[in-house]
């Protein structure tokens, strides 16, 4: 921990706008230990939010679900946190002046995170229309990070048959989300397997072009708006 704080400190020297949650926050015993700090109850969670504030964090990142199970199409690695718990987590962060970025997968979990007030959904794999409408109606920005799947096809680490199905499902969902009017934004999940920093966001852009059409001015404008909303939301007031 602390690397992102150092990165933010030196970023202006390179012309980079760098914002950080300092660390992600996850429920003890659930996914998130690789990037964050755990809590067992709401008091511990609130204390972690206050620590982020003390250390100058720009926003709060919470982990409400596991990750995709790449061995099978359509499943997430663990049961999501409950709605009431997520709602309280978002409320506490908002009360401290933070926006909330939620690592969330699965239709019900995405829908509930959006309704709970999460400002953005990172990943959002396996959403359904109800979840998409929830994101639209609650002005939640959706950052699909679909390049994580695309870049692994053909690498031999997982079944290409499964990866292709996940890619096709994700592509259809992005297309439908765009049609519905969900605010989409580019994000790469850089640091994931075969998603290097810098190149990852270029790969994500290429995925969106493949899904929504190359040289589509409306798509470009929509994604620029999404980037603007992310920059606007994720800075501590």
Question: What is each model feature region?
Answer:
Residues 19, 100-103, 122, 141-143, ...:
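Structural detector of well-ordered beta-strand residues that form the stable sheet scaffold
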